[in-house]
Amino acid sequence: MKRALIVMPLLLSLYAGAQELYVSTEPASNMPAHSLGIRMTSRFFKMEHEGITGIRFEPEIMWGVSKKLMIHVAGLASNQMQSSIEPEGASIYAKYRFLSKDDLHSHFRMAAYIKGAVINNPFYPQMIDNSRKPYKNAELDLEGGASGVAGGVVATQLIHKLAISGTLGYNRFMNNTKNRLPDEMSANAVNYSLSAGYLLLPRTYRSYEQTNLNLYVELLGKANTDAVSRNHYLDIAPAIQFIFNSATRIDLAYRTELFGNMPRNVFNTFTVRFEHNIFNVVKRKG
């Protein structure tokens, strides 16, 4: 009984903001304090240069340090830049919620985040034969593209079953462990996003064991700011999400470009994610 009284508020808080669990971005809200999350993300994408499907696996561990601070640690493995699926490096992400205004059926939150990555990929894919298209890519990221750091702010508004969130961030790309950042690639970029999530089911909440069905649409933009490669793009990423027992979720998302002038090796990505959360890992004393 005591355990139920402790865990139930955590599950209720997760349910109340279930439509904030965006697939392509992070909300300003955090996971419950002292909770542990295990996540596996698989991405499938057509590589324009090779004309074949690339795959990236991202195992991730998440920890709710407190109600205001959470940390993610992720590994990366892919065949995007290597001849086969190889480890690419790792990243660490931290988010601190500095503003929270809660009402009965709504809340507004703001948070700051920082991310760092160490990547061992080359900046140009390994050549196996000469039958491929010329490699044209001006997009870098911290998910296998380049080592570097990023930081920014997130604001999220929840109103009943609808959650709207916006992100503005700065990225500084650096040399990879074995390769120098090419002079023709921008070392600086700005990222921005606008995300909406809607809780479709259940229509009436009766138990934390009910399955949640959430629908999302996210606009994801990036602009390189260095004069050597000043270009931009805006993508759209619709997604569907299932949450079971308020602790386990499955995400399905598709991302494609709306418009832009940035040369890219990948324009379309299909994402499958599995996540499981364990609440109250560290029990309170007394």
Enumerate the language-model features and the residues they cover.
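Short glycine/proline- and aromatic-enriched beta-strand/turn motifs that initiate or cap beta-hairpins
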Residues: 18-61, 119-123, 133
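Short loop/turn motifs that connect adjacent beta-strands in outer-membrane beta-barrel proteins
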Residues: 26-33, 68, 100-110, 161, ...
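Residue-level signature of outer-membrane beta-barrel architecture
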Residues: 29, 42, 63, 96-98, ...
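Residues that define the transmembrane beta-barrel architecture of outer-membrane proteins
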Residues: 32, 53-57, 85-90, 143-149, ...
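Membrane-embedded beta-strand positions of outer-membrane beta-barrel proteins
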Residues: 38-42, 73, 94, 110-114, ...
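Transmembrane beta-strands of outer-membrane beta-barrel pores
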Residues: 42-46, 75-81, 98, 114-120, ...
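Outer-membrane pore/translocation modules
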Residues: 83-189
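Outer-membrane beta-barrel "beta-signal"
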Residues: 91-94, 194, 266-286
